[in-house]
From Swiss-Prot:
It catalyses: 5-oxo-L-proline + ATP + 2 H2O = L-glutamate + ADP + phosphate + H(+). Keywords: ATP-binding, Hydrolase, Nucleotide-binding. Belongs to the LamB/PxpA family. InterPro entries: Glyco_hydro/deAcase_b/a-brl, LamB/YcsF/PxpA-like. HAMAP family: PxpA. Its EC number is 3.5.2.9. GO terms for biological process: carbohydrate metabolic process. Signal peptide: none annotated. This is 5-oxoprolinase subunit A. It comes from Clostridium kluyveri (strain ATCC 8527 / DSM 555 / NBRC 12016 / NCIMB 10680 / K1).
């Protein structure tokens, strides 16, 4: 039996600005990563996204990012491990309070954007994130790029981790994601192609990188980005395609 968690980054609007169609996307995913105010999101949006996630029985996770509203958390900022630790704890705490106020349970933490990419390769930053998560609640599951330093540091400290793969992104030979600065080479828009790649990741633990070689990959959770106009169509079709191939879509259960 093949199974996968389907996660999406949500609550990424700000004030009067709306990003994506969260209410509809929640019908097709099993885990939501909710922005916590640094790269996107605000108290009202956080509260509403938590409420909608609970209504749809979707696992709730904090999605902490760098303090970069103008750049959507995707610009490089020089920060120390101590600063990263504080930012992560602060943002987790903010979302944790909303989840608790609605009678829910927080499930996981997944860093956003540049913070996620830095933690994939930088052991010290990865350790700061893992320690921040563990010290808030050691029961939280840490989502990170498959094969990354973040997964290694999460495992080292004693967190349960979930290795994440991407349906709409391409990979490099070292297992990292192709930078968005590469333009079209970084993004997969063909839904059938994306679904076939994901199925291969789940079944065989392999993905073809941009250098035309197979690399090993572990797929516990699949990310669908929610910040573009076609996200709803993409997630709906990926969900159906995987189910048609016999893959169970289900949230990761705490052990």
């Amino acid at each position: 039996m093949y199974k996968i968690d389907l996660n999406c980054d949500l609550g990424e609007g700000f004030g009067v600005y709306k990003m994506g169609n969260d209410e509809e996307i929640l019908k097709y995913i099993t885990s939501a990563n909710i922005a916590c105010g640094f790269h996107a999101g605000d108290p009202k949006i956080m509260h509403e996204t938590v409420r909608l996630s609970l209504l749809n029985d979707v696992a709730i996770g904090a999605h902490p990012g760098l303090p970069d509203l103008a750049g959507f958390g995707r610009r490089n900022i020089n920060v120390s491990p101590d600063e990263i630790y504080d930012m992560v704890v602060y943002q987790i705490g903010a979302l944790y309070a909303f989840v608790k106020s609605e009678g829910g349970v927080m499930h996981h933490v997944k860093p956003h954007g540049t913070l996620y990419n830095m933690a994939a390769k930088n052991k010290k930053l990865a350790r700061a994130i893992a320690e921040g998560v563990y010290n808030v609640n050691p029961e939280f599951i840490l989502f990170g790029l498959s094969g990354s330093e973040l997964i290694s540091e999460g495992n080292r400290i004693g967190l349960r981790t979930a290795s994440e793969v991407f349906a709409d992104r391409t990979y490099q030979l070292d297992g990292s994601l192709t930078p968005r600065s590469a333009g079209n080479a970084a993004i997969i828009t063909d839904i059938d192609k994306a679904a076939e790649r994901v199925y291969r990741m789940i079944k065989y633990g392999l993905v073809m990188c941009e250098q035309k070689k197979d690399i090993g990959i572990k797929a516990d959770t699949l990310c669908i980005h929610g910040d573009n106009p076609h996200s709803l169509i993409f997630v709906r079709k990926i969900n159906k395609h995987l189910k048609d191939l016999g893959v169970y879509i289900e949230k990761i259960i705490h052990e």
